[in-house]
């Protein structure tokens, strides 16, 4: 059990027949009446976001989520198959469960799979990935590191803004949290 006073972004709770993650919270103490905690919660299973108010100090069951490192082995139809390299147990997730991070998912990549009991909830990709540029405008003599940026498409199909000097075939490091270019590899 966790007190509503201890809510922080990223805390997972069992509420309303599901697992919810706290996205935002605000502890409010009105001049008259008792304090309360206004939260924005995201359903881990389906991605729904709701706003909910809890009384200050209200006890809520904390979700017991297990995180395990698994490798993305292949894609079958609309499902992505992950395998635990120690137990050889498979987990299947849809693109909707993975979310917009699916654009950086590559076969052979290791990722953290989060489970609630036996049910697979979501995947956390590494903070950065190294991918090859497959399409971008050619570099022109005089392009510098301090110049502007141009769009580039990497091997997984994701589009990233890169410096002007990057060419097709180069391997670049990308931050998966904000889709930004970090450097050459």
Swiss-Prot record:
SMART domains: EFP, Elong-fact-P_C. GO terms for cellular component: cytoplasm. The keyword Transcription does not apply. The keyword Protein biosynthesis applies. It is found in: Cytoplasm. It comes from the Bacteria. This is Elongation factor P.
């Amino acid at each position: 059990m966790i007190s509503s006073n201890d809510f922080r972004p990223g805390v997972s709770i069992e509420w309303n027949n599901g697992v919810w993650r706290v996205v935002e919270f605000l502890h409010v103490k009105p001049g008259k009446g008792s304090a309360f905690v206004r939260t924005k919660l995201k359903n881990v299973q389906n991605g729904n976001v709701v706003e909910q108010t809890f009384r200050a100090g209200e006890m809520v069951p904390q979700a017991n989520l297990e995180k395990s490192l698994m490798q993305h082995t292949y894609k079958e139809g609309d499902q992505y198959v992950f395998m635990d390299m120690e137990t050889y147990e498979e987990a299947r997730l849809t693109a909707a469960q993975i979310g917009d991070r699916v654009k950086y998912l590559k076969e052979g990549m290791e990722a953290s799979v989060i489970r609630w009991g036996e049910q697979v909830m979501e995947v956390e990709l590494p903070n950065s990935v190294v991918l090859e540029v497959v399409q971008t405008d050619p570099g022109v003599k005089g392009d510098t590191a301090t110049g502007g940026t141009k769009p580039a498409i990497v091997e997984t199909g994701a589009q990233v803004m890169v410096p002007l000097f990057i060419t097709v075939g180069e391997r670049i490091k990308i931050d998966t949290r904000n889709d930004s270019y970090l450097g050459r590899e």
